[in-house]
Amino acid sequence: MERFMKNPKGLTTKLLENYDWDYIELPVTVNTEKLMGWYEEVVANNMHSAFIFSADKMTPYVKQRYQPLVSWWLGENTWGAAEQWTLQWPVQHDGVIPSAYLANEEQFPEAMDPDIEKNSVNLDKYFYGAYKEMYDTFPEGTFNVTRLLRFGKDTGLKKHTDVEPPDFLIRMHVQLQSSSGSHWFFGEDLEREYFMEPGKVYLYNTAIPHAAVNRDDDYWVMIHNNPGNSAVDHLLSIDSLHVG
């Protein structure tokens, strides 16, 4: 199996449950002009809701037992702080929302729900325009744990995995804006470098060590989400799709 695949026809979730591939470019494109218009409105109206990846900004929202993890995770990160907006949550919420597994129990009791992914809803303040159009066009179950993420200049994420073997998770990225200085790196030594093109949609293997960095002046902007297995199978079977 190739590390990077552009023709996923014939693949299934079952066939991808291994650690021999990094990411897949789907035959799917999106209207970046429309989505960037939506993104600019979201940022203009909701900076107060951004979860910012820096120790002082994250700590107030993170459960106590993960405080050392935050310090460790960010301590080796020499890049600037990424910003993230959570687009789905079990209740309507207007403030900062961390990743559910990190969330402070007192501030976010709903995050303790073991079925939080199934019980989450789209937050009304984000669910409109080009994003809603895209959401409604993709197969049911595509957009779970959906977040808007951006990297400014010299901003990134250090090497990490999102799950540990034998666990397995496929994540989807919709690229709204990227440029020649924005790259993902995969592998134990981050030896495999990839550029994800604006307007394209990708699946990637979160169990493979990976990191990201943006070296350009422009923001690197994406939507990322965890499609369910049936949605992944549907996405892999698509011949061609343009949204917007």
Put a short name on every predicted segment:
Residues 150-152, 166-182:
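Short, conserved beta-strand element in jelly-roll/cupin
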Residues 143-144, 157-171, 189:
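A short beta-loop-beta micro-motif enriched in histidine and acidic residues
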